[in-house]
Structures are given as C-alpha cells and as structure tokens.
Amino acid sequence: MLQPDDSFSQEPILADRSLRPLEEFSGSLGHKVYQTLRQAILSLSYRPGEILRKPEICAELGVSRSPVSDAVARLANEGLVDVIPQAGTYVARFSMAEIREGAFLREAIELQAIELVAESISEEQLVALRRNLTVQAALLGDGDIPGFYQLDGEMHEMIRSFTGYRKLSAVAESAWVHVERARRLVLPVDGRVAATLAEHRAIMAALEARDPQAARAAMRLHLRKLLTYLEPLERSHPELFNP
C-alpha cells in the first residue's frame, strides 16, 4: 500500500480572502456571483464550516442581495454550502463518503480518457502538454502552489478534451466537485507537489510512447494518491470534516 509522508502538520492552503472580481467571469450577473463564490469555496479561501455572511459578500462585490442568495442556493444544490434554518449559511465541511464517490467517478472517466487519448494523440497535442509541464515545473520552483494547482487542473482538462467528447468536462466538473476541493488539502503536505509533478511526467512519458496501458497505469497511480494522503488529514484536521 502507498504510504504518505509522515508530516501532516502543515495547515491546508488558504487562498487570498478576497473574492475574485466579477469581471473575470462571463455570463449574467447572477452567474458571475455564483462563479466567484464557487471558486472561493473550491480554493479553500472560504474555509469548510465557515459562516457565509451575505451582507459582507454583497458589499465586497457591489451587488444586491438577490444574486448572492441565488448563488448560495445553487451552491447548496451542489453540496458546497449548508443552509441551516434559523442558524445561518455555512461552507460545507468535507464528507469522506462524497469524496470517495467522486474519486471513484473520476477514476472511471479519466482512466478511459487517458487510454483513448494514448492511442491517437497528435504531436500538436503532445506539444501542448509538454508546455503545460514546463510551466508546472517553473511554478514548483517558485513555490507557487496555487499556480501549480491551476496548471495541474488544466493538464487533466486537456487530456479529457483530447478524447473529442465535448460533454465530458461538464460531467467531470459536476461529478467530482468535492474531489477538486479536497485536492487543495493535500498539496501542502511535504513533498506532495514534487511527487505530483513526477506523476504527471510519468503520464506524459506514456503518452509520448503512445502506450495506452502504461498511460492508464500511470494515471491510476496518480489518482489513487489522493485518498492515501487525505485520510490522515481527516484525523489531523477533524474540524474540516463531517463527523
């Protein structure tokens, strides 16, 4: 069985407390408010269990209460927010059951995707992935963990897009939203970011060899690391998890 590093004393990543500007998102005002709140929750800028104060959010974003309330309702439907009558609105704590289910769905989709892509990947697609890995390495060297996290996600998104199935990413985003948030917890663990880059390089090597089985094996190893690292964090940070 894979063993994580012994040090789990580091605090989970907490991003900048400010919400991202609405101008960074497209769509209606309501959708923009939803997106910036969603990103704040996924990035752990809003900590699990933290109360969401709508007046403060309205003031920071410069919007009325209506789009904020609508956004909170959407987030509650996704399981990212808990609305407790007469008590308040809170960022949902992590649920290991939901994370395990999301990890199962993620593996089912991404293993099939990587195997399919390895059979037909083009040189242009390989160049795009190499470029992404180069930036990942640079961000790791700079100690930019949030930036690395973003490029990590973009690499997986590229691989899914290379399947040619246009609906796959939307399905993926919905199916493992809790996994995406949980990944933020494991990146600060000593050595985890460097190990992630090494795993990405192994995936890349299998794709360059156009070896579907090797690509599948490398992706499986990479994906299964999450729970290996996350379970000890549940013990060391119980306040972030549902009992």
Report the location of each language-model feature:
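Short amphipathic alpha-helical interaction/hinge segments
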Residues: 167, 179-183, 187-190, 227-234, ...
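Conserved amphipathic alpha-helical segments that form helical-bundle/coiled-coil interaction surfaces
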Residues: 102, 123-184, 198-206, 214-225
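Residue-level signal for the nucleotide or nucleotide-sugar donor/cofactor binding architecture
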Residues: 63, 191, 210
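Short linear motifs at protein or domain termini
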Residues: 1-119, 124-125, 161, 216, ...
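Hydrophobic residues in alpha-helical segments
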Residues: 41, 117, 140, 207-210
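Alpha-helix N-cap/N′ positions at the starts of helices
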Residues: 86, 109, 131, 195-198
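Short helix-capping and inter-helix turn/linker motifs at the boundaries of alpha-helical repeat units
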Residues: 28, 126-127, 191-194
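Hydrophobic/aromatic-rich alpha-helical bundle segments in the mid-to-C-terminal region
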Residues: 189, 212-218, 238
